[in-house]
Amino acid sequence: MVNMKASMFLTFAGLVLLFVVCYASESEEKEFPKEMLSSIFAVDDDFKQEERDCAGYMRECKEKLCCSGYVCSSRWKWCVLPAPWRR
């Protein structure tokens, strides 16, 4: 009977330890994506200036020219991807 109590206590202590380790690693992992996303989407000043000078995808191109890689749709007056089937 003593062995059963000791094994139950050790099992319970092991589960508590496993929970604590998992919780600690999960809290560290939550910070990692935030740091990674902020570094990915960090924009330098040159890119911001280029962004203001041209219109991006599905933006009006009446007054602004489309950014590189896009063409102005003659029908809708939006910047779209160039494709052979477009008029």
Swiss-Prot record:
UniProt subcellular location: Secreted
Single Gene Ontology MF annotation: ion channel inhibitor activity
Propeptide, residue positions: 25-52
Signal peptide: 1-24
Keywords: Disulfide bond, Ion channel impairing toxin, Knottin, Secreted, Signal, Toxin
InterPro entries found in the cross-reference section: Huwentoxin-1, Huwentoxin_CS1
Pfam families: Toxin_12
Record-annotated disulphide pairs: 54-67, 61-72, 66-79
Domain characteristics, as noted in the entry: The presence of a 'disulfide through disulfide knot' structurally defines this protein as a knottin.
Protein name (Swiss-Prot/TrEMBL): U3-theraphotoxin-Hhn1a 2
Species this protein is from: Cyriopagopus hainanus
